[in-house]
Each structure stands twice: as C-alpha cells, then as structure tokens.
Amino acid sequence: VSQPDSTSAPVADCYDLVVIGGGINGVGIAADAAGRGLKVFLCEKDDLARHTSSASSKLIHGGLRYLEHYEFRLVREALAEREVLLAKAPHIVKPMRFVLPHRPHLRPAWMIRAGLFLYDHMGKRKRLGASRSLRFGAGSALKPAITRGFEYADCWVDDARLVVLNAMAAREHGAHIHTQTLCLGAKRVGALWEVEVQHADGSTRTVRAKGLVNAAGPWVAQFIKNDLKLDAPYGIRLIQGSHLIVPRLYEGEHAYILQNEDQRIVFCIPYLDRFTLIGTTDREYTGDPAKVAITDQETDYLLNVVNAHFNHQLQRSDIFSTYAGVRPLCNDESDNPSAVTRDYTLALSAAHGEAPLLSVFGGKLTTYRKLAESAMAELKPFFSQMGGSWTAESTLPGGEDMTTPQALEEALLARHTWLAPAIAQRWARTYGSRVWTLLAGVEGPQDLGQAIGAGLFAREVDYLREHEWATSLEDILWRRTKLGLFTTEAEQNTLSQYLEKATQRSHAA
C-alpha cells in the first residue's frame, strides 16, 4: 500500500506556501489555502496531531470560563464555530449537555446566570439548546450537599480525527502533505523561501515557496530562532494540561463542569461509552514538549476535585489511562497559568519585497477554522490570485451526504447484514460517509482480511495507511481510532507484525 503523498512532489518544486506543522492550525491553514487555489506543501516531523492537537479535552466549546477573563471576542467566535463544525463534520462532532453543580461559596448564582445568559445569546444557536437551572434529587451522582446546578450546551469532538480530516481536505484540494518529514531550516533567497526538509528515510530535499507559515505549535518560537535564525516577535508559554481516563463514573451522556476551590474548573466527560475523561490541569511547563507526562501532583489534583463532588470516590487504582499535552500560548505576562489568554496571535514579517513569514502563536481547537481564515487575510496581499473564504459552508471528508451517524449506521447494517453493530457504530462515528470507500469491494466478512482484535481488521488498517498517513501502531490505535484503550498486548503485537509486513510489501513494490 502506498503512502499518500510521500514522494509526490519533485525536488526544488516551487509552491505558493510551505506550512510547518501538522497540528490543527497547520492543517487548517493548508486546507483553507489549497481550497483558494494556492499550491501548498505541508511538513510534519512526526504524525498528524501527534502532540498538542491530540491531547485536548476534546471539546468544541465557547469557553464559559473565558468570560471571567473578559475574553468576549474569543467566546463569541468560539460559540459561533460550534454550529459551523457540527455541520462540517457530523460524524466526529456531537452536541453535549454540560451540568455545572452550584457551589455558592465559589461563585454566586447571579454570576453564573449572567454568564450563561451571555453564552446563550452571544453565539448563533440552531441545534444547541439554551441553558437552564437544575435541582438534583435523591438519585443524583453528586454528593447530597450539592442540590442545585445549571445546564448548558457545547460540543464534543474527536480531536485527532479533526486534524486528519483537515489534512485530507487539503490533499483533495491539491496540497502535498508530508508526515515524518522534518524541516531542517529555511532561508529567504530573493523573493522566495528555500526550505530544506528531511524525510523518514534520511533523504533531504529543498522546497521553494513564495510564503512560509510557521504552525509548529509548542516549537513555534524555537523554530524561528533555531531554524530561521531570526528573532521571535512573541514569547511562548507552555502550559501543561493533563487528563485521567477512568471507568464510567456516572450514568448519562452529559458532561460535568466542576468548580474547584482554586477558582479553576475541571470537566468530567463521557468517553467511548465505557469511560469518563477527567481534565484538565494548568501548570507551567519548561521541558521538551515531546516528553510531557502527567505528574503525581496533577493526578491528586484531579482526583480531589472529582471526589469533592461525586458520591463514588475515585482512587489511583481506578485510573485506566492518562495523557498530557502542552498548550503553546502567547505570553501575555499573566501570573496565573489559567488566566493566560487562549486567543491566537498571528505574526507576519515581510520587509518590502521579502517573502512573507506568518507565525501562529496560541489558538484553540474550536477556533482553528477562523484562525486559518485570519491567516489567509494576512497573506492575501502576497497572493493576488487567492480565492475567497470557503470553509464555513463546506463539509470535511466523511461529512458529505450524511445526516446523522445513526442513519449511516443503519444504512451500513442494511447493506452489510453480517456486520457487527458495534463495528458499524464505530465506523460511522469515525469515517462518516468515507466508510463506503473503506468497504469498496467488500461482500462479506472474509473480505475484511486478518482479524487483529477489538473489531480492527486488515481492511481498515490498509485504508488508514493508504488514505490517512498512518504508519505506526500508535498512529492507528491512538489517533486514527481510539482502539488503544480496548486492545490487548497480544493484539497490539499482531498489529505491529501486520504493519511490518505491509511496509515491506510497499517497499518491494
């Protein structure tokens, strides 16, 4: 099976834009630019969504707590984006109700009501319901002392798949997407950038471009200093956010937003039917962003917040898995990590006649599409042929010809009556209408190939290698699917062996 776009562009080809970074902002900009007719080359040193973009709380949300920091522009933009992304990717984005237990000594009821009133009215709502007050009865999962609360709507998203789908959209508009490709350095030569990149096999090439976008996330400032030999216009603050995954903590498909004594909030979110996701933390991080991991202090912090609210008391032994990431936020000199702005800053540098450099500082998953539109507005003076904005009305791959995941699931089971319902459900919520590409030519279970485990078959692995840049076990089990939580060590070994053979076959071909 060939890797998509691994060697599709000749050496020293000239592009309009080279994008550094395969996180949500990089692929969002690549897709937007390619759809406007620009010729785009994106390189990512690891896998798509390998770092910050797969370590989020997996929410598309307005950011209720940002209202306390008066970030009205960010909240308004984020609220509006919820409905846009629901329509763009109905297979991986879903509405979710959030329950906020009232703790009067932390925030008075009038303050929460005022915040929710703004939340309801600042963004256009079509599918998302309004907020309301709640009273908790005897059957509540919360402690008896917590009798009142509030409920409002936001959305959940599969964060890593949002990145992959944007990369696919970019490719379908002509962009060249190269994973496992490190940028060794770049320099301005006349009116162009010359960018040297190194592929996974060690081979190097030079790519020329009229513009360079630095969307390196946690490495954005480091890239400017070390690889471009320039001065970074802003400092970056790395704020670590860690999460726990525990067995399902309560019944229902709603999330909880818990207020802690330190004025921070922590989410408890239903995850993959069997689990509850708990997070996040906020702590300054000064190490290598690639090596971030949850600390004992963070683990205790999250357990304590949850145990202060729920009847069911969690212990360390209940933790099924953890993950951590760093948010690369623009340094606004705030003393409190929680108060550092989540808004984005775009820094354009281009003296007269120079090829432009656009660097992305900060940003959040929810507003990636608006960030990309803003990036295009910054670059417009350098690309007179650039088309207009288009991403608000377009679906992401898999969102085409789709009403709901449930309807797609039913169509899958009607056409393939032998298919296990759990697999049909997972495929509908993972691939959307692209599941028909995955199943092209499949008449019966024998056509799915080798059974690897947890509902994963060779056919799906081949699809992910061919269409979604997946090369490793981790790419497949943790980012393209979430089957890492459901597979045994033996099943993971089976997958590793299958991938090894598949790689050998593709090299032989």
Each language-model region and where it sits:
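Glycine-rich Rossmann-fold phosphate-binding loop(s) that bind the pyrophosphate
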Residues: G21-G23, K45
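Dinucleotide-binding Rossmann-like beta1-alpha1 core, especially the glycine-rich loop
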Residues: K58-G139
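Glycine-rich FAD pyrophosphate-binding loop
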Residues: A34-A55
